[in-house]
């Protein structure tokens, strides 16, 4: 079951859904149903498109080594996935233009433009000159940009509603910062695991432990005044520690199982929102 959860690109939408609801839980905010639905649909469309385009470009260049099982799955089932993705994209458009308030639409257009620019940069046949890229956000790598965009999409609904109700944005921003680092670690770990031999040393274990320790310390600081934000930071720390443990046992897992597990361990906030 977890195998197809990953192969059908349902993993990222699930993570987006869980964390958006968790951020809302941390701020005592109830999100309208259309918000998590929009996030899940949009994430699924983006990931399906990303994997289909990756497969198409690699097959055209006869670069089969960079293709993983998820890419082959999407290529084999493209006649089903493409119409479904188009339908999901249309549903997203309907939600945005009929249910989303105009001020929120204006704010989110900035995030959408940034995501579109990144997506175009990654999949454009004519890449931007390297000197342009080095002069613009030279610190950011692909994994960090993905983590920041993903986090922004998940936290903005709760952050805007919490701020509108007079809540301080600091606790939720702190939790979002930890989640952004966790999302980066997830992407970085996947990249390292897929490009290293199982016997090669990986930095993921130590990086995950450092992030887990930082998260635990932040959770302790937040507990007295913001117990829910502290609990969410603690959940992120547990996820980080689980990524470290996956790094230790990666030689015993198949690449597909390892890739699916890397996203599965991000669902720790379920323990908070379902209790």
Regions found by a protein language model. Name each.
Residues 1-45:
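Non-cleavable N-terminal signal-anchor transmembrane helices
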Residues 7-12, 34-38, 79-85, 106-110, ...:
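Alpha-helical transmembrane segments of integral membrane proteins
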Residues 155-217:
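Aromatic-anchored, glycine/proline-accented short structural segments
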Residues 79-128, 208-256:
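Transmembrane helix-loop-helix
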Residues 41-56, 113-126, 178-195, 239-248:
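Transmembrane alpha-helical segments that form the membrane-embedded catalytic/substrate-channel core
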Residues 20-38, 93-107, 154-177, 219-230, ...:
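Helix-coil boundary and interhelical linker segments in multi-pass alpha-helical membrane proteins
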Residues 16-21, 114, 148-158, 181-187, ...:
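Hydrophobic cores of alpha-helical transmembrane segments in multi-pass inner/ER membrane proteins
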Residues 1-14, 55-85, 119-148, 195-210, ...:
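Interhelical loop and helix-boundary elements at the membrane-water interface
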């Amino acid at each position: 079951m977890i195998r197809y959860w990953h192969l059908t690109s349902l993993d990222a939408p699930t993570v987006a859904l869980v964390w958006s609801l968790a951020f809302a839980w941390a701020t005592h905010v109830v999100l309208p149903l259309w918000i998590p639905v929009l996030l899940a649909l949009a994430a699924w469309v983006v990931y399906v498109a990303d994997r289909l385009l990756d497969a198409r470009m690699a097959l055209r260049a006869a670069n089969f080594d960079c293709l993983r099982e998820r890419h082959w799955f999407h290529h084999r089932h493209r006649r089903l996935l493409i119409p479904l993705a188009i339908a999901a994209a249309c549903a997203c458009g309907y939600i945005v233009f009929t249910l989303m308030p105009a001020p929120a639409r204006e704010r989110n257009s900035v995030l959408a433009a940034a995501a579109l620019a990144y997506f175009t940069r990654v999949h454009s046949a004519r890449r931007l000159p390297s000197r342009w890229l080095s002069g613009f956000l030279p610190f950011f790598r692909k994994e960090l940009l993905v983590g920041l965009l993903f986090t922004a999409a998940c936290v903005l609904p709760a952050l805007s509603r919490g701020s509108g109700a007079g809540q301080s944005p600091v606790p939720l921003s702190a939790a979002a910062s930890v989640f952004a680092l966790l999302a980066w670690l997830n992407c970085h770990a996947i990249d390292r695991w897929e490009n290293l031999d199982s016997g090669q040393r990986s930095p993921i274990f130590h990086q995950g432990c450092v992030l887990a320790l930082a998260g635990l310390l932040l959770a302790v600081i937040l507990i007295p005044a913001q117990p829910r934000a502290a609990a969410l930071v603690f959940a992120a720390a547990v996820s980080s520690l689980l990524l470290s443990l996956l790094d230790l046992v990666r030689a015993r897992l198949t690449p597909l199982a390892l890739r699916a597990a890397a996203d599965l361990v991000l669902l720790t906030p379920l323990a908070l929102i379902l209790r």
